[in-house]
Amino acid sequence: MVPWLGPDDPFPPVERALGPATGAPGLLAASADLLPSRLIDAYLRGIFPWYSDGQPVLWWSPDPRMILVPDEFKVSPSLKKTLKRVLRDPAWEVRVDHDFRGVMRACAQAPRRGQRGTWITAEIIDAYSSLYRSGNAHSIETWHDGRRVGGLYGVAFGQMFFGESMYADVTDASKIALAALVAHLREHGLEMIDCQQNTSHLASLGGREIARKAFVAHVRRAVAEPPIPWQFDKRVLAALTGRTEPAAPSGIER
């Protein structure tokens, strides 16, 4: 059975998460609370919340884990062309932390194939907004003609970024935000973005799965490192427009 966590109960070891033969592989625990302290502790252990309205808070640590290594990010010819256009045209902007809650609300409202409703509830928005105020959550936003047209948000501790969700109101707007994030993280030597679960979209951009054991080991090392700055703009995209193939293989375990 999945353990129920009281306010003072610690998370069980991630190895106790439900396995692939169950109906909920990766489910580790449930609780009634989503306190900022609980949320921080979860991320530092490689755990994340995912649940719907009417459910308790469900905590997950899947095996394998989907990640994106910044140096393995795939820039297709069409995306490269888009990034060059964004760099040339002053109507396009990349803003960081300009409208964090707005990005979360837009992600909540974005239609998802095969998904009814959203897991980004008002409770989730409030909890992650608390992390944003403490400097541990960030939004990367694509703007065009003064209007926010796409973006993503996630959690950052030390040298680790945990991606949460993205949306696009116009073609490639979320990819522009992700490309800007990747370029910024590469510039500062971050080796991994947590993508939580496998999707064909992430795989097309260079995402891949690694064993949970390797993921958690990397998280423990990375979150102990000094944090990186979170001020940048669209000029970081220039680093991605010179090639279409990923860089040499990283040291992240396969």
UniProtKB/Swiss-Prot annotation:
Keywords: Acyltransferase, Cytoplasm, Transferase. It comes from the Bacteria. Its EC number is 2.3.2.6. It is found in: Cytoplasm. The keyword Transmembrane does not apply. GO terms for biological process: protein catabolic process. It holds the Pfam family Leu_Phe_trans. InterPro entries: Acyl_CoA_acyltransferase, Leu/Phe-tRNA_Trfase, Leu/Phe-tRNA_Trfase_C, Leu/Phe-tRNA_Trfase_N. It catalyses: N-terminal L-lysyl-[protein] + L-leucyl-tRNA(Leu) = N-terminal L-leucyl-L-lysyl-[protein] + tRNA(Leu) + H(+); N-terminal L-arginyl-[protein] + L-leucyl-tRNA(Leu) = N-terminal L-leucyl-L-arginyl-[protein] + tRNA(Leu) + H(+); L-phenylalanyl-tRNA(Phe) + an N-terminal L-alpha-aminoacyl-[protein] = an N-terminal L-phenylalanyl-L-alpha-aminoacyl-[protein] + tRNA(Phe). The keyword Acyltransferase applies. GO terms for molecular function: leucyl-tRNA--protein transferase activity. Functions in the N-end rule pathway of protein degradation where it conjugates Leu, Phe and, less efficiently, Met from aminoacyl-tRNAs to the N-termini of proteins containing an N-terminal arginine or lysine. NCBIfam families: aat. Belongs to the L/F-transferase family. This is Leucyl/phenylalanyl-tRNA--protein transferase. It comes from Burkholderia multivorans (strain ATCC 17616 / 249).
